[in-house]
C-alpha cells in the first residue's frame, strides 16, 4: 500500500478520487451468526474493513492535495441496521453476519471520516452498488456491472455542494 501511495505521488502529485471496493464473504449466505467462525469474522473484517482503512490512511495525504477529493466506500444494503432489523424489509431474511457487520463498520467509518474532513473540500460517502452480476453476486443478480458502478461514479464526481457522510444507491439516500 505504501509503495502504491509513493508511486501515485511521484507520478501525479495528488489523488482526486479513491474508490474503496473491498468485499468478501467467508461464512456463506444464510449462515447463522452463532455458528460463524471467528476465523471467518477475522478474514472478513481484515479485507472489508481494515484493508479499506489502511488504503484510505495511506492515500489521504494525496487526497488532501486535490481541489475536490472524493472517497467512495463500497458498502452494501446488508450493512443497513435499519433494514436488517425491519421484518418488512426485503433484506430482513438475507443474513451473513460477518459480511453484514463489516459493511455496517464501513458505513460507520465513512461517517467518522466525513465528519473529520467536513471543513475540507473532500467528500466521503458509502455506496451500495446493488446486486451486481459478478463472481460474488452471481448470474442471478439483477444489475449489470455498468449499472452497479453508477452510484460510485456519481459520488466520485459530486459537485462542491454535494453530500458527504451519506449512504447511497442510484442517487437515493439509504437508511443506516
Predicted regions and their residues:
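Conserved amphipathic alpha-helix within the SDR
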Residues: 1-13
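A short local structural element in Rossmann-fold oxidoreductases
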Residues: 2, 83, 136-138
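Structured loop/turn residues at beta-strand edges in well-structured enzyme cores
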Residues: 10-13, 39, 120-122, 160
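Catalytic loop of short-chain dehydrogenase/reductase
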Residues: 24-25, 29-45, 64-118
Amino acid at each position: 500500500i505504501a509503495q502504491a501511495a509513493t508511486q501515485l505521488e511521484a507520478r501525479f502529485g495528488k489523488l482526486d478520487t479513491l474508490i474503496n471496493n473491498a468485499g468478501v464473504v467467508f461464512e456463506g449466505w444464510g449462515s447463522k451468526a452463532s455458528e460463524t467462525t471467528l476465523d471467518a469474522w477475522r478474514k472478513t473484517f481484515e479485507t472489508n474493513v481494515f484493508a479499506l482503512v489502511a488504503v484510505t490512511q495511506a492515500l489521504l495525504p494525496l487526497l488532501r492535495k486535490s481541489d475536490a477529493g472524493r472517497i467512495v466506500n463500497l458498502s452494501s444494503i446488508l450493512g443497513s441496521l435499519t433494514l436488517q432489523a425491519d421484518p418488512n424489509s426485503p433484506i430482513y431474511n438475507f443474513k451473513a453476519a460477518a459480511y453484514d457487520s463489516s459493511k455496517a463498520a464501513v458505513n460507520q467509518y465513512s461517517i467518522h471520516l466525513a465528519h473529520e474532513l467536513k471543513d475540507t473540500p473532500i467528500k466521503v460517502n458509502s455506496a451500495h452498488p446493488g446486486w451486481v452480476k459478478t463472481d460474488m453476486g452471481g448470474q442471478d443478480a439483477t444489475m449489470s456491472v455498468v449499472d452497479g458502478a453508477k452510484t460510485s461514479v456519481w459520488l466520485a464526481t459530486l459537485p462542491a455542494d454535494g453530500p458527504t457522510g451519506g449512504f447511497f444507491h442510484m442517487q437515493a439516500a439509504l437508511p443506516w
